[in-house]
Amino acid sequence: MGQSRNDASKRMTVKEFLEAIENLEETIYQIQITNKFKKSLDLSYRRSLDLKLLKDVIHTLAKGDKLEAKHRPHTLERFKTVVWECHIKPDWLLLWQQTDEGLILILLDTGTHSDLF
């Protein structure tokens, strides 16, 4: 059965997601969000993806903790700079860069395999 109107109203909105990211606690990385990421975030919301799952992964990264193996974090070879990718769900990915020198986490993009590649 599809999502009821009540269930849909409990979903985290894009605005709530951005506020939650801004107010994450116990983080060591400063989070920067690209415009591309924001546009892709809107698309993820329209696809009814659970933004809380994405927030939880980003919080783990911002704390400097390792992601669980189910997220399959790895670097991508196709970029000039080091870009990381992980799976939020099997066909929902997060792309980011991080610098340990300045402790900055840059959220580059999110979407499906076909969106990103």
PLM feature segments, named:
Residues 1-30, 36-39, 51-52, 56, ...:
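Enriched for short, Lys/Arg-rich terminal
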Residues 40-47:
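Surface-exposed, Lys/Arg-rich phosphate-binding patches that contact polyanionic backbones
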Residues 81-83:
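Conserved N-terminal boundary motif of the eukaryotic protein kinase catalytic domain
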